[in-house]
């Protein structure tokens, strides 16, 4: 619709058919009129050829009329041909202008499409770059969290191992202490039992001695 609105006003200003109608409706008139001297010379030649003065003048006037009509027709044909050539030239010029205008519009539309495509490609590239950066950032955060979690787990395992070792050491120490205490108790018990046996033996010996 835009192209038609822009082209049709141009054509309305240069309508070739209006020129043709104007040419066809024009009335051409003879622009050729022989000089009086030439007419007199023609009459004298006819008189010398044997024609009377009246007949010579009649023939001269007739020839003048015929020549004028012939020249008028020739002038009309030449003018019509010139007008046709002018109309054809105007049509060619109009078509060339239309073609140039359409090519310009096509180039402009192509430029617009190309610019839009370039803009879309740039936006896509920016989006890709942004997504890459986001993915890299997310992966970095995940790796960092994993490393931190691994570190925490390692620290926790180390702490547990340390606690276990400390507990084992404490238990071994307690066992050693308990073992020493048991040994001491055995020694004390043996000493007490030995003393008790000695006392009982002494008592028995005394009883046997007196009784």
UniProtKB/Swiss-Prot annotation:
Record's GO cellular component terms: mitochondrial inner membrane; mitochondrion
Entry annotated with the keyword Disulfide bond: no
Protein name as it appears in the record: Uncharacterized CCDC90 family protein C3H1.08c, mitochondrial
Keyword Mitochondrion: yes
A Pfam family of this chain: CCDC90-like
Subcellular location as annotated: Mitochondrion; Membrane
Annotated organism of origin: Schizosaccharomyces pombe (strain 972 / ATCC 24843) (Fission yeast)
Assigned keywords, A-Z: Coiled coil, Membrane, Mitochondrion, Transit peptide, Transmembrane, Transmembrane helix
InterPro entries cross-referenced by the UniProt entry: CCDC90-like
Family note: Belongs to the CCDC90 family.
Membrane topology summary: Single-pass membrane protein
TM region positions: 191-211
GO terms, biological process: calcium import into the mitochondrion; mitochondrial cytochrome c oxidase assembly
Predominant cellular place of this UniProt entry's protein: mitochondrion
Lineage: Eukaryota, Fungi, Dikarya, Ascomycota, Taphrinomycotina
Residue runs in coiled coils: 105-143
């Amino acid at each position: 619709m835009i192209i038609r609105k822009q082209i049709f006003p141009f054509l309305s200003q240069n309508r070739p058919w209006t020129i043709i109608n104007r040419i066809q409706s024009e009335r051409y008139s003879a622009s050729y009129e022989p000089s009086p001297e030439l007419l007199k010379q023609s009459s004298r030649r006819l008189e010398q050829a044997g024609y009377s003065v009246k007949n010579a003048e009649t023939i001269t006037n007739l020839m003048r009329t015929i020549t004028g009509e012939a020249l008028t027709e020739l002038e009309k044909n030449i003018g019509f041909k010139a007008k046709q050539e002018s109309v054809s030239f105007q049509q060619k010029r109009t078509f060339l202008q239309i073609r140039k205008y359409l090519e310009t519009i096509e180039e402009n539309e192509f430029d617009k499409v190309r610019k839009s495509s370039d803009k879309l490609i740039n936006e896509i590239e920016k989006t890709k770059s942004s997504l890459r950066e986001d993915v890299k950032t997310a992966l970095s955060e995940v790796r960092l969290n994993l490393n931190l979690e691994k570190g925490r787990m390692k620290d926790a395992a180390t702490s547990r191992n340390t606690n276990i070792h400390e507990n084992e050491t404490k238990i071994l120490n307690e066992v050693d202490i308990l073992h020493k205490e048991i040994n001491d108790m055995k020694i004390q018990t043996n000493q007490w039992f030995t003393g008790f046996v000695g006392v009982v033996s002494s008592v028995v010996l005394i009883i046997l001695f007196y009784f």
